[in-house]
Amino acid sequence: MSRRVDNKGKPVTAMLQVQAVHRDKTQVVELKKTTYLPYLFNLVLPKMFYQSTNRIVMARLYPDVHEHDKQAAEYFEGFQTPCFEMPASLFPGEVPMDKFVFMPTVMLPMGFEAGGVFGPGVLPRRSYPIDLMASGHKGPTPPLFVGLSSLYVKLNSESESCLGNGGDQPASNVALVYATHPCKHTPKDSKELMHSNDYSLSIAYNLPVPPTPPSPYPLRPAPVQYNIYTPDLSNVHMLMLRQRNLTVALLSTVNHPHVPAVAFATMGDEECPKFELPSDVFPICEGANRPIFLPMRFLPKGFDAGCIFKPASLSELWFVNHIGRYGTPQPQLNCAITPPLFVGKYRRGTKAVKILKEIQMECERKFSQSAQSMEEASLQADEPKTPTTQGFMVMETEQQTPPKGAYCLESYQEASDTGCVVKVTKEEATEAADTQEKNELHPINVETEPEDRGEAEDRKKYLSCFKVDSDIDLITEAMADMGTAEMRLLAKEEALPGVDCARALDQLRQVLEGRGQIRSQADQLIQDHIYRMDRNRMLALRQPIRMCSGCGMLH
């Protein structure tokens, strides 16, 4: 048994080759009245299926794509259709072979001399081919096509060019490209959004970003899941041929991955501008397939509102009818399901960005940097650098032993090399002012001995460094032990253009002083979020039980 491979990353119907079978040309059967008879002439298989000696092919069908042709079923009722003997070992268990419908020759896929279908829910789950149905599939079993391929197959030139040599290559686990199929509508009655005056079809483009160095705090990659999909599109440019109120763009699960922070922001914590989707174009999706509206800070530039349809929420038939041949292929982690879709409301009066000029300038800048680095390159081998935890705050104390949670440094230059950005010293001006005020109230003439004065001048200062992930309570306790502490930036303000140093220090001071209040507020926000989720869950459980439109079962 050989498994199917992907044809250049294009989404094709899942298929299996089973075994070789010989058929007599005179074998026919009468077509009876049936409730499922699809038109499969346009179903094209990878080239390996036509070149193999295994003639029986099984293919999973989708009811929303391969619909029942009622007129053909009524017309061909009573006609003689070609048939073949189904091997007993083809399906395990008891299979209702009397419900298998052999199809007329004109409705069979190209390259088949006989074949038929099991309708939706006809095959038991234990008898359905394991490789053609997901383990978590719910509802009735999908329809299944079982056909007998011809000994000598001659495909037309269009199918040959479409297949190419993609079927001869083994399948890989890398990201695949989802490509939409062209629809057969004429421009006059076409449903494609490219021909509409109310919508525009955009291309989601990401500017190339320079590679970032490895972080000393590597984050665990988020597992691939499609129960929720909320990408960050703030740095994504939408390329459109014409400006319209609404624009539609295919997204990529590789270039636009799911961001958990965006998902938390959409759960009622931030305001998400919404708009009404036209019902004549977009289907009514409820529950887990509903469109997710994004907050303003995660939208592309120039958009007032936007929503995301997660992967597999829209049917392939919708993409065929409304996107068609104008869809730009995007790399996907899973090409067996439909890609995610962005629908955005464009801001009126926004000036379009000359994206091509911006891309050209970005490429020229990167080329000049690479050329300069090549000129300055030396033959000396670089020593491997072990990523270390960056410093955060250097503290000047009079005690040789560093505070709890800190470590010693020799100089401010070492602190700067470590990555310290804040310098904390004991504020001497306040003590001098208090002493002067006390002497004015109670004048005492005391002569300072030269030895004591020399000891005060020669008093040594010790430097202690706190890491960026040090305990904030330990940092605050060390500053409290100093008495009156003064915070300053270690670097000069001239070296930080565009940074409000005073405001940054003031915000750090507020965090250190009000850390308890910040923690209580964050805890209260989490408790409020838990309460909202529990309330919504209880409201959902109180809803009346209805029949699911996807699987036909009661939920």
UniProtKB/Swiss-Prot annotation:
Per UniProt, the keywords (alphabetical) are: Repeat
Where composition is biased (Basic and acidic residues), the residues are: 430-441
Ranges for region Disordered: 430-458
Q: Which domain of life is it from?
A: Eukaryota
Task: State the family it belongs to.
Answer: Belongs to the DM7 family.
Identify this protein by name.
DM7 family protein GE17493
Native species: Drosophila yakuba (Fruit fly)
